[in-house]
Amino acid sequence: MRVGMRCYGQNDRSEFHCVGGEMIKYEIIDLHKIAIIGKEGLCTKEKNVVQDLWQQANSNFSDIADLGMKNADGSFVGFWGAMSDETLSFLPWTDDFSRGLYLAGVEVYEDTEVPDGWVKWVIPARKYLVTKITPESYGETFRNVINSLIPKLGMKLAGAVCDFTEPATGQNKLFFPVE
């Protein structure tokens, strides 16, 4: 078994900002490229397939469990809800962030072979604004970061947003590619 560890780059800063009445704690990090194997689908305003994709991935997880990158303690490094535009260029979703590709999956090594019925994405190394979320705060935090915090910091969204769950802690985070 190969053991992996996510190595974040240097933190530029970790700060709090009040945006839209919500206190948002965030940090800016550099993250190496990320490989994910999961179930892929197209989301639109008319049909959000995110929950269906997670259901498919979870129901068939035994197919890929041995492929997932693990920490030294045997826990998985992380589960990603990765997003991309329809060209798979990892640009932001279109149609007011309602249309794009979504991949529900587990982080793997880049050279991992993809089993039949699964898809692998390799997201390029980037700078991210990262903030912790809860299921209840997801929508409001997403909108506040996109519409207020990123512009307030003099930055711009540079790609599709991804959500991340760290199984060891149960912590959920949003990763906003910025420049």
Where are these regions (language model features)?
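A solvent-exposed interaction/effector surface
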Residues: 4, 8-179
